[in-house]
Amino acid sequence: MWLPYLIGQPSRMRPLNTTEGLGDRLRLIAFAERQAFHAFNEAIIRFPNSPKGLLEAWHWVALEEAKHESWLLNRLAAIGQKIEDRPVSLNLYYSLQNCQTPKDFALYISDAEERGRIGAEKFAEVLKTQDPETAEIFKQIALEEKAHIALVDKYF
């Protein structure tokens, strides 16, 4: 489920203006997308009595998370960095597993998605001259996260 990621205590991020530092961030965010993918799919099973339409929406978001992860991992490879070079944490996934109701899950993951959206917007801005290709990926992810976040208001 988590391979080829190296699970463990994350190392300190290296400077963003280095290839390694950019790789650290791409890896971290790609892994957050992987955790969200699995959490959404598991929520579909855990909360079968969710509001009508929500399970289908979660399935759609899970596929979106996988798409974002693939973009980030492709970029990670393009800059010569490996997924398994640095450890990543399962804290997000474990936190989502602690949610006891569909609403708790939706609120918690929406908050995580909002933090991710803000981070992606900041990376897009910071990287637009240093690395326009990565900046564009983050810009698109931030844009798409808005639709994921809006699900909370739609269903709760």
Segments (PLM) and residue ranges:
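Non-heme di-metal
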Residues: 1-156
